Amino acid sequence: MRVALVAVVAALSLSACSADPGPPPVQAKAESTAPIIAPGRPGEPARTISPDEARTAVPAPTANAADVKYVQDMVTHHRQAVDMAVLAPSRADSAALKGLASRIKDAQGPEIQYMTTWLQQQGMKVPDHHASHTGMPGMATPEQMQALKAASGKDFDRLFLTLMTAHHQGAITMSEQVLVGGSHIKIEELANDVAATQSAEIRRMREMQAGL
């Protein structure tokens, strides 16, 4: 009997030593529910979310009709702003206005190229240089553009600031609309940048208007 008992104890000990322990269930649960810090949108604070929320919180990578229309319209909108800005060096009286016009041209030129490339990548039409801008907010009429080209000195400065302020306000309106109706994260970023940059430029132009 003693020999048999010793054999049983030895077998149990060997079995215990060779067993492969599984992962601690409590630790596995803790790892799967660890919180994640998600950055907020521009102007919004970061927030804590669960892993399950994180898996569904990725912005939609696809574009919808609102995104495409915004980019197509903004290409045309930006082109007119550049057409206005390139008149300033030879017609404006104010050095500050010439500097502002140069910054507008330098900012919106690359944005036109970015938007053109994005439309091509989406397989969408890029507006030509004679595209209609009927219904776009803030666009100068052909008559207003002719008047700007004919003006010089302080008369040019006044008309330029009036037209470009309205033009910027139109771009902000368009950007606000796509932030509500669009779905593509890159276009959301673009619209936020356009709205922020042009809001700051409107404030500067109003200061310049007050000094004329």
PLM features: residue spans?
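Bacterial N-terminal signal peptides that target proteins for export
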Residues: 1-5
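Sec-dependent N-terminal signal peptides
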Residues: 6-11
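C-terminal motif of bacterial Sec signal peptides marking the signal peptidase cleavage site
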Residues: 13-16
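All-alpha RGS (Regulator of G-protein Signaling) helical domain and cognate RGS-like helical scaffolds
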Residues: 18-212
